A protein has these predicted regions:
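Short, solvent-exposed loop/linker segments at beta-strand-coil boundaries, enriched for Pro/Gly
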Residues: 39-65
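Glycine-centered tight-turn and secondary-structure capping sites
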Residues: 65, 75-83
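Extracytoplasmic loops/domains of multi-pass membrane proteins
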Residues: 72-74, 414
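Short, exposed coil/turn segments at beta-strand boundaries within extracellular/luminal domains
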Residues: 88-93
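A structural signal for short, hydrophobic/glycine-enriched beta-strand patches
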Residues: 289-290, 296-447
């Protein structure tokens, strides 16, 4: 968010806060209390209506129709009182709080008051504004390049804000005071965690099973263990509030059912914080899957002059491994699609140096395969010095620029590698579009998780800001809940 947008956000929050304060101060000195009465009561004279003897409030108007008693209440001075109604088959009592400036709230210190619907509506406007800014930034970044970790973090935040927006709309439709909104939020978080936990467990099982296949094929390494580690990292915060509950309730023998207890609100804070963080991280993980899958399945525009084939390990006899063969075949397939679409030919750039245990360079091995597939040598430009993806892009781009400084470039790699390779190209200001070759599913899952962790690292400053904001909001919400329960 830029400086200008932060200023606009501050002005919006200040303006809405001021409007909310004015609306509540103008309307909050009176309150319309509606009480459902037994149908056997025919008229208001059959009821006994009483208030506290301290003259904190007074009833200025009474009306009874269709089984509902309507009372108009006005504040006299600060304090706490009640409205007691009794009749044949009916008894009710409502606590009334009168605050500074004569503002009346019902039942709880932060209960419903006249005009307070403006508060959740203001929050809805702020969330909508933040969401619109993030969508605008996301679209702008996507237009520049699809391959950026900032796109993942932005989409994750868009998903998170969207869920908040839906939750806020539901709150407004059911609004019954600020305190009840807090209860609804805490209940929503609880329901969300219970609904998501089976999904988290299922994902953990699927990731673990797929990683056993990967470990069997590739061996045990930290990179190959990422999925299992991440599974535990998501499960632990999901069950953490339950562990805290057991600690307070079973070991310390402290009741968490008393809403006035400080321990109850510590538990609420930990639950709200844990589940909010987990839901935010899940939104980032979902956005990682969406963008990585979109990148891998996307077909580049048919305007390409060159297509780089990213190298990887070759066989001992100098022929291509199945993975590298798939990359070359995908490049050939794209060249055919482009030729059929507009007649434009493409130059292949097989890229990859010679490893210590390889008899020829990966670039030369790919070239040999292309020749076998009927590609003419004048359509092949070999890059044979690179040792990694960064150098694949860098050295290939340098060769291309020597021939034509204004070329449209594509690259072919394994589908799970498209997004990461695209990011490496973007960091070098090389404008490219990737196309993905198929591979085993267990490579996909590990790649998604690797990109998720890379996003957390690359966008750590933004994520820490969201982390701090969630912490502050959680503390404010639980503090207000505690104040309201006193």
């Amino acid at each position: 968010m830029g400086k200008y947008e932060r200023i606009k956000l501050f002005i919006l929050i200040f303006t809405l806060s001021l409007i909310s304060l004015i609306v509540i101060m103008i309307n909050g000195k009176t309150f319309d209390l509606n009480i459902n009465i037994n149908d056997n009561v025919k008229n208001i004279e059959d009821m006994e209506i009483a208030t506290g003897s301290d003259n904190v409030i007074k009833i200025t108007q009474k009306n009874y129709s269709n089984g509902i008693l309507h009372l108009k209440i006005k504040s006299n001075h600060k304090g706490c009182s009640f409205v007691e109604v009794s009749s044949k088959g009916h008894y009710s009592i409502n606590r009334i709080f009168v605050h500074e400036f004569g503002i009346i709230t019902l039942d709880r210190r932060l209960g419903k008051c006249t005009g307070d619907i403006v508060v959740p509506i203001s929050i809805l406007i702020i969330i909508t504004y933040l969401l619109s800014i993030k969508i605008k930034h996301y679209k702008k970044n996507i237009e520049y390049s699809s391959y950026q970790y900032s796109n993942i973090s932005s989409l994750g935040l868009i998903l998170f804000l969207s869920s908040m927006l839906v939750n806020q709309i539901i709150q407004i439709s059911r609004y019954n005071g600020f305190a009840h909104s807090i209860d609804f939020l805490l209940e929503s978080v609880d329901v969300f965690s219970k609904n998501m936990f089976p999904i988290v467990i299922l994902n953990f099982i699927l990731v673990t099973v797929s990683h056993f296949k990967l470990l069997k094929k590739e061996g045990i390494t930290w990179k190959n263990m990422l999925g299992v580690i991440l599974g535990f990292a998501i499960i632990i915060p999901s069950v953490f509030p339950n562990l805290v509950y057991s600690f307070f309730n079973n070991l310390l023998h402290l009741s968490l059912y008393n809403e006035k207890s400080i321990y109850y609100h510590i538990y609420l804070l930990l639950k709200l914080f844990s589940y909010s963080i987990v839901s935010y991280f899940e939104c980032i993980l979902i956005s990682t899957v969406i963008l990585a899958y979109k990148s891998a399945t996307r077909i580049p525009k048919f305007d390409k002059d060159y297509i780089i084939i990213l190298g990887c390990m070759i066989k001992k006899d100098g022929t291509l491994t199945p993975i590298l063969k798939n990359r070359a075949d995908r490049a050939i397939e794209f060249a055919k699609m482009q030729r059929e679409a507009n007649g434009k030919d493409i130059i292949f750039v097989p890229s990859g140096g010679k490893g210590m245990d390889e008899i020829i360079s990966e670039g030369e091995a790919i070239k040999n395969y292309l020749l076998e597939q009927g590609i003419s040598e004048d359509k092949i430009l070999v890059e044979n010095k690179s040792k990694n993806t960064y150098q694949n892009i860098k050295f290939s781009n340098e060769l291309i620029k020597k021939r034509n400084s204004n070329s449209n470039i594509a690259f072919s790699t394994t589908n799970y590698h498209v997004f990461r390779a695209g990011i490496i190209a973007t960091k070098q200001n090389v404008k490219v579009e990737g196309i993905g070759a198929k591979t085993k599913s267990y490579f996909w899952i590990n790649a998604f998780i690797r990109e998720f962790i890379a996003t957390l690292y690359s966008e750590k400053k933004k994520i820490i800001k969201v982390f701090v904001l969630i912490t502050i909001i959680s503390m404010i919400i639980v503090s207000l809940s505690f104040i309201s329960a006193i």
